[in-house]
Amino acid sequence: MKNSHIYILYGSETGTAEGLAESLFRSLTRMGYDVLVNSMDDFNLENLLRPLQCVFICSTTGQGEMPLNMRKFWRFLLRKKLPNTFLNDMQYAVFGCGDTSYTRFNWASKKLDSRLRQLGAQSFSSRGEGDEQHPDGVEGVFAYWCNHLYSQLAAIKTPSRPAFGEFDLLPPSFQIIIDESLGCKVKGFEDNNIVRHSRGKIEATLVHNKRISNIKHWQDVRHLAFKIPNFERWKPGDVAVLYPWNDDMSVNSFIECMGWESIKYSPLIISSNVAERKLPWFPNILNVFNLVKYVLSIHSVPSRTFFEMASHFSNNKMHKERLQEFSSYKNIDDYYDYTTRPRRTVLETLQEFKSVQIPIEYALDAFPVIRGRQYSIANRCDNSTGILELAVALVKYQTILKSPRQGICSRWICDLHENTSFNIDILPGFLNLSYQSNKPLIMVGPGTGVAPLRALIQERIYNGLKENLLFFGCRNKSMDFLFEKDWEKYTEEGTLKLFCAFSRDQEKKKYVQHSIQENGELVYNLLNEKDGMFFVSGSSGKMPSSVKDAIAGIVSKYSGCSISDGYSFVTSLEKKNRYYQETW
């Protein structure tokens, strides 16, 4: 039976690909197409047996890996038993969200496109490659790509119904109704202490929340420790996922902006109006207050889709026109100047556009949901203690706006008291080094990039592997030398060689790549003579490429080869899984 829907399937790690998928869903729905949007792993694989049109939008994570919510789908496509005619009835398009500062730029979308072709699927529109380094970001490239997609799609598929007007309000994707059978204010619904925050699968209790950067340092870095069940397991390189929630003051301000005070504690029943559309996670007690507190991301930067939605619910002509301008790609620079560059939040936007009052029925269409935040686990798994540790640099900075900018998870961690219990998740990382082998391991981890390296060092020491080198970098020895006592202990025991670069402790700035160059002969011998491994962890700015430049230079200097051959040496390490880079 022919499938009349267009499927928009995404693989998203940080929410970018998912946001683009939602935007395309609204655009195609407005054009009159029947559209379904889901993560690839939530897609019903039986649909692949029918003729269908699919648009795939995916990001790349790790070293060219697939995002978590498309791995099941990807594993299915990789089955060797699938014939090369399996997807003969599929017409598809692929858009990748990437960053050219990474070596394997848009690797996931390229691999997906190639595999779909191998299985017989036909591309009806050229593959798009979004780039965070583009002047207009991924969204700018996506908007251009979509215009081409629309014309190509029109050639193969006729809309199912008349198109909506440019400024017509689309029907809500979710049905949100007040459960009148329980009354508007049921006893207990206003008591938020009994809410079970069970979004993750693993019960955790915070036992330690301590600042480990100097109180005088500009950045607050926290060492968090959680007590979790002893049977839980993780490996070096794995990540913990924290699910923050909004503070009560912000929640009440948001509810006041929306005019929802009269239904603040009203119990809700929520279902999907769109076939195969998965509902987000909800707390066990679902009322308006808890929907805003635990589900809606009111401190995120508003998307263009938000402005388009908000324009429908303003009775102020000037506000409506301005909101519509922000929603249009034609005014993308104005949108960036108002939102992205100053990092203005959804709540702050609503406080400025006071005429906007979005009805509760459109809450899940207008506002993004809170996403889990991933942090590298900073200690080895010891089931005798059941303790999981993280090192988290809290995000707080100033823009042109009066109030400091603060990430939702950073805001949450600041107010998180010890003995608070909630659920978390542990996800597998992508570390493909043979770290349990008796080979030297050279590690580079400036700042909180040292967190996964701490777990790795502890694991190797536990297994009796002593040839560990750590190049650590920070601003000042007295300000942000993270886990200093641990490194002192390991060096005294002879299980670690430590090289530090304190960039601001001398007149000329010194970074990790300079420390690597100063110890070039040692690094070269470990890599070339002893088949050593190399692990870079930390910021995705200039550091990773500077480290790679340093290694290439060292190889050239001590082997007598050209600098080009030095880079080829690094590439060969990557291919042999001896050079790993985990940056964010």
Swiss-Prot record:
Binding locations of FAD: 343, 373-376, 407-410, 584
Reaction(s) this enzyme catalyzes, per UniProt: 2 oxidized [2Fe-2S]-[protein] + NADPH = 2 reduced [2Fe-2S]-[protein] + NADP(+) + H(+)
A Pfam family hit: FAD_binding_1
Recorded superkingdom: Eukaryota
InterPro entries cross-referenced by the UniProt entry: CysJ-like_FAD-binding, FAD-bd_FR_type, Flavdoxin-like, Flavodoxin/NO_synth, Flavoprot_Pyr_Nucl_cyt_Rdtase, Flavoprotein-like_sf, FNR_nucleotide-bd, NADPH_Cyt_P450_Rdtase_alpha
Binding site residues for NADP(+): 448, 503-504, 509-513
UniProt record, GO biological process: [4Fe-4S] cluster assembly
Required cofactor names: FAD; FMN
Domain Flavodoxin-like: 6-150
Any Gene Ontology CC annotation: cytosol
Domain (FAD-binding FR-type) ranges: 199-436
Gene name for this UniProt entry: tah18
Family to which this protein belongs: Belongs to the NADPH-dependent diflavin oxidoreductase NDOR1 family.
EC code: 1.18.1.-
GO terms of molecular function: flavin adenine dinucleotide binding; FMN binding; NADP binding; NADPH-hemoprotein reductase activity; oxidoreductase activity
Protein name, as recorded: NADPH-dependent diflavin oxidoreductase 1
Positions with a binding annotation for FMN: 12-17, 59-62, 97-106, 132
Function, in words: NADPH-dependent reductase which is a central component of the cytosolic iron-sulfur (Fe-S) protein assembly (CIA) machinery. Transfers electrons from NADPH via its FAD and FMN prosthetic groups to the [2Fe-2S] cluster of dre2, another key component of the CIA machinery. In turn, this reduced cluster provides electrons for assembly of cytosolic iron-sulfur cluster proteins. Positively controls H(2)O(2)-induced cell death.
Natural source organism: Schizosaccharomyces pombe (strain 972 / ATCC 24843)
